[in-house]
Structures are given as structure tokens and as C-alpha cells.
Design a protein with these regions (language model features):
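Well-ordered alpha/beta subsegment
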Residues: 309-330
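Electropositive, beta-rich accessory/interaction domains or terminal extensions
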Residues: 170-270, 274, 279-281, 286, ...
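Cysteine-cluster motifs in flexible loop/terminal segments that predominantly coordinate metals
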Residues: 3-16, 288, 293-298
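A mid-sequence interfacial segment
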Residues: 88-123, 260-295
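A conserved acidic, glycine/proline-rich C-terminal tail/linker
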Residues: 288-314
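Acidic/histidine-rich alpha-helical segments that form the ligand environment
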Residues: 27, 31-40, 75, 93-133, ...
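Short, charged, low-complexity loops and linkers
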Residues: 10-26, 100-102
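Short, contiguous alpha-helical
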Residues: 1-7, 13, 25, 44-94, ...
Length: 330
């Protein structure tokens, strides 16, 4: 974050030009929930173990993310209240140091992530806030919106680090292999239609040529792809529901994976692209017609965690076609 150009990151794919203030508000509002899903039932010893001496543990990353969120939120409060406000330099550790490991309790870390995430979401959700205001750091001038998006970059990048750390330590989603059963696109709305054997390009915003009709609730960077399971679809169809691949709006239909094992932070090599799961997709009324009784909420996380569709970030762009392998935790 230098205050003079849009922030980008080659490692995680972050590009501030692809983000809106409301995207950041949604991210921070869900931060604690995503973290809870990502580390649910993982042994505390694994959560406190560093994958390498100079790489933070999962819980150290969580503590850092809540601290960064709190510091940037405090600065934003000042900037939004007074344009040109002078800001101090925050004293935050930017990386792990070998030998300074800290053992943490997971509930305290999760509570802090939820508390700070909700506070930042409330700030970002303010109507007509002057996001063009600037703050003056000792060595740079930073716009309020850029500072907010820097915070979004920090927590999302470290959420990626958490997923990689859990995979390296054998926690979270286990390694597995499946395949791409179908790729689906539309000009907006459902159903999305089968691409057949055509190759698709997966960019930072998802499958090229696919569109969303509702940009208020869809199309955020952490919703670049929506993935679902042929096994779940087959189970629903066998129960009498008129549903098929693409009907529920997923643009990547996968086969051969233990769907209930997936969680936020899991990484999937889909064709040559690398996808990281972000959060369960919330079903909507447009999907009513695919269920015999109209009860589309049966595929919500709250009702049936093993039936949910998953949203994902694109961490590495690539190409894919139906039949390609899908490697979980490559």
C-alpha cells in the first residue's frame, strides 16, 4: 500500500480495481464465520503449529488479521471524519520471526476476528461516507477507500495462507482427486448451460463469458466461481426434484469428491487454474422451481452443510474443459 496506485498482488491475485467498498463490507461481515468453518474440528495443536519456523501458525495469522483490521478501522474513522488527517505509523508485525511462537486459544482468536470484522463491515456499510478523503502517513498520502481495500487484501491473503498451512499440516480438507463433470455459463440468471467439450478460460473474475444478473449479491472477487457436486445433484434428482447440473447457478460441476469434507481455504486445482474455496453459497428464490416442494433452502449451509454449493476465489488463472482432473490440496 503506497497510496499512489491501485494495490495488486501477483501471489493471491488481489486487484483493488476489481473491488468495491460494498465487497469489502461483505468480506469483513463474514470474516469470523468463514474462519470458524475453516478451522472447525481441527486439533488445537495443529492450529498452533507453524508449518515452517518463520511462517505463522493458523491462530497467529488470525490474531494478526484481527489486529490489522482494528488498526486500519481506527485510521479510517479519523480519515472519514476529517479529510487530510495526519496518521501515525502503526506498530504491527508484518511477518513471523523464528523463535517467537505464541500459543493461542482458538475461541479468543475467533471472537476477535468476528468482533473486528463486524466493526469494519459496519464502517464500510455507511451510506454516503466520504471514501475519497485522504489520510497523511509519515511517508505517503492514502485515500480512505484504498486503505479499506488494503485491509481486505491483508485478511484475504492471509486466509489463503491459512488454507495452505492447514494443508501442509494435514488439517482441514483432506487431499483428494475428482474431475470436472460439466462447465456452465449464461448471460445472467439460471439455469446456466453446458459448455460441452469446449475449453473455458478461468480468469480472476471467473469463467470468461459467464455473467451474473444480480450484481448486488453476486460477482464479488471471492465469488468468482460457484462449484457444486454431481453426487449431490443426483441425490436430489433421485428424491424427485427436477434439478440438473447448472440449474442452481454453479458454473463448475465436479464429480468424485467427498463434498462434505470441503471447507473455506481448501485449494482445488481445476484444470490448470487454482481455486480457493471462500464460503458456502446462499440459495435464493430463483432456484425454487428446481425443487418439487419449492424448498430451495434445503441446500443452505444451515440446513444441509453436505449439500451446499461453494464459492471460490481464483488464485491462479488457467484453462479447463469437462473431463479435466480436479486435485484437492495440490
Amino acid at each position: 500500500m503506497d497510496g499512489s496506485r491501485p494495490e495488486t498482488c501477483a501471489e493471491c491475485g488481489f486487484d483493488a480495481r476489481q473491488w468495491r467498498v460494498r465487497d469489502a463490507a461483505t468480506l469483513f461481515g463474514a470474516l469470523g464465520f468463514w474462519w470458524r468453518l475453516a478451522i472447525a474440528d481441527v486439533d488445537l495443536e495443529i492450529l498452533n503449529r507453524r508449518p515452517a519456523p518463520a511462517v505463522w501458525s493458523v491462530l497467529e495469522y488470525g490474531r494478526h488479521s484481527s489486529a490489522v483490521t482494528a488498526v486500519i478501522r481506527s485510521a479510517l474513522e479519523l480519515m472519514l471524519a476529517e479529510d487530510g488527517r495526519a496518521l501515525g505509523t502503526p506498530a504491527l508485525s508484518a511477518s513471523a520471526i523464528e523463535g517467537n511462537e505464541v500459543v493461542l486459544g482458538h475461541e479468543a482468536v475467533l471472537d476477535a476476528l468476528e468482533r473486528e470484522g463486524q466493526a469494519m463491515a459496519a464502517l464500510a456499510g455507511r451510506q454516503s461516507a466520504p471514501w475519497g478523503n485522504v489520510g497523511k502517513l509519515p511517508d505517503a498520502t492514502i485515500q480512505a477507500e484504498a486503505a479499506l481495500l488494503h485491509a481486505a487484501h491483508d485478511v484475504s491473503h492471509h486466509f489463503m495462507d491459512v488454507g495452505r498451512g492447514l494443508a501442509a499440516l494435514g488439517g482441514g480438507t483432506p487431499a483428494a482427486q475428482g474431475r470436472v463433470a460439466q462447465l456452465n455459463v449464461s448471460a445472467g440468471g439460471v439455469p446456466k448451460l453446458d459448455l460441452g467439450s469446449d475449453e473455458a478460460v478461468i480468469g480472476w473474475r471467473g469463467i470468461e463469458g459467464d455473467r451474473q444478473a444480480d450484481h448486488k449479491h453476486h460477482g464479488r472477487p471471492f465469488q468468482a466461481l460457484c462449484l457444486w457436486s454431481t453426487e449431490v445433484i443426483a441425490e436430489l434428482a433421485a428424491a424427485g426434484h427436477p434439478i440438473a447440473a447448472g440449474c442452481a447457478g454453479e458454473n463448475v460441476t465436479l464429480a468424485g469428491l467427498e463434498w462434505a469434507s470441503l471447507r473455506p481455504g481448501a485449494r482445488l486445482r481445476v484444470g490448470t487454474a487454482l481455486v480457493e474455496l471462500s464460503h458456502p453459497a446462499v440459495p435464493c428464490q430463483k432456484q425454487t422451481r428446481w425443487f418439487a416442494d419449492g424448498d430451495f433452502a434445503r441446500i443452505s449451509y444451515e440446513r444441509n452443510p453436505a449439500w451446499v454449493r461453494w464459492y471460490g476465489w481464483v488464485r491462479e488463472q488457467g484453462r479447463v474443459r469437462a473431463g479435466d482432473a480436479v486435485i484437492v490440496q495440490p
